Amino acid sequence: MSEATGKKAVLHLDGKEIELPIYSGTLGPDVIDVKDVLASGHFTFDPGFMATASCESKITFIDGDKGILLHRGYPIDQLATQADYLETCYLLLNGELPTAEQKVEFDAKVRAHTMVHDQVSRFFNGFRRDAHPMAIMVGVVGALSAFYHNNLDIEDINHREITAIRLIAKIPTLAAWSYKYTVGQPFIYPRNDLNYAENFLHMMFATPADRDYKVNPVLARAMDRIFTLHADHEQNASTSTVRLAGSTGANPYACISAGISALWGPAHGGANEAVLKMLDEIGSVENVAEFMEKVKRKEVKLMGFGHRVYKNFDPRAKVMKQTCDEVLEALGINDPQLALAMELERIALNDPYFVERKLYPNVDFYSGIILKAIGIPTEMFTVIFALARTVGWISHWLEMHSGPYKIGRPRQLYTGEVQRDIKR
């Protein structure tokens, strides 16, 4: 729990003083508890909740000014390079990294639930073949509550925990199938002899005709890091959506489906896809210099550089760049678009205009390049983001349900018509 500092903020309102308690977390700025303002007949006004803490949480801490991202106290770069994704999942869910024995047990639990009910596979046939994979994901993830309804008592901790495992285990299967369905290929089932990232890539790219298909270990490691680097990011739009939906008592599958819907918005989950679209618009390496001049003149936007939260650098980007270099070296790809991206990076890291404004490449810039190099189409980028973020969403959902909570009910500043009568 947060602790009262003993300090109070004083609000002068209509000739009266309202004392508002100030609380401290373990890290980050103090917060002012404004709920007593309601008794005065007033609301606070904070569009976008930019200065509002909607909850207490022990899961993730971000200091955007210093470029810090911690999961349960551990720096993200350490988790991405010294732990794997499922260890990070265990950490987010339980608060501590697993012991060797706990890791074996947790990995086995996840493997045991990677299959989905056979009727779920038929559910895909209701979608058009040209449907966006995110549209499919919203539908099939929400529909899981119709197939696993025997464990939906959100007051039962055992039901909550098994649902968390099921979501982490089944989302990669559904994500890969959403791709297979849109390209008209048979579904590939998960294999218990593969790790989490290998399994996903196998379900994405293996076919019944290619029995010798093997996942490149460099690509599996890269995918695992992408999953880890996107596992959670505090109270962002989609996580807040999951919490808000969860506050109504909605089942967890519905809540995660709501999170996927929020993530689908281009302002949230579409950043790495936007990077590839920008590269398409630039066209060739020869056009990069002129494009960057247009950026300076504010004629076009530079996607994948800078970050809304991180004012200095994105702590995930260094690991992602290293991973990007490893993937491109391993594949030896001669892709004009990747060469174009590298030229963008070179200019941004050396041009004083971008350096002074701290417009460094962020995680979305490098992840987009990696996913393209692996062979994943751009419409699947946000699906992979949703796959990785599922553990963050369900961790916040579990945290909220572990104690007392209130249904979310934001207020508004009404600017419409005053009361009037119908006149006929």
UniProtKB/Swiss-Prot annotation:
Entry's InterPro entries? Answer: Citrate_synth-like_lrg_a-sub, Citrate_synth-like_sm_a-sub, Citrate_synthase, Citrate_synthase_AS, Citrate_synthase_bac-typ, Citrate_synthase_sf, Citrate_synthase_typ-I
Q: Which residues form the active site?
A: H307, D364
What pathway is this protein a component of? Carbohydrate metabolism; tricarboxylic acid cycle; isocitrate from oxaloacetate: step 1/2
Q: Name one GO molecular function term.
A: citrate (Si)-synthase activity
Q: Which reaction does it catalyse?
A: oxaloacetate + acetyl-CoA + H2O = citrate + CoA + H(+)
- Record's keyword annotation contains Membrane: no
Give one GO biological process term.
tricarboxylic acid cycle
GO cellular component term, pick one = cytoplasm
Top EC category: transferase
EC number(s) on record?
2.3.3.16
Q: Which Pfam families match?
A: Citrate_synt
Q: Which UniProt keywords apply?
A: Allosteric enzyme, Transferase, Tricarboxylic acid cycle
Any extra remark in the record? Citrate synthase is found in nearly all cells capable of oxidative metabolism.
Question: PANTHER family of this UniProt entry?
Answer: CITRATE SYNTHASE
Query: Know the name of this protein?
Result: Citrate synthase
Could you tell me which species this protein originates from?
A: Acinetobacter calcoaceticus subsp. anitratus
Q: What is the lineage of its organism?
A: Bacteria, Pseudomonadati, Pseudomonadota, Gammaproteobacteria, Moraxellales
Protein's gene: gltA
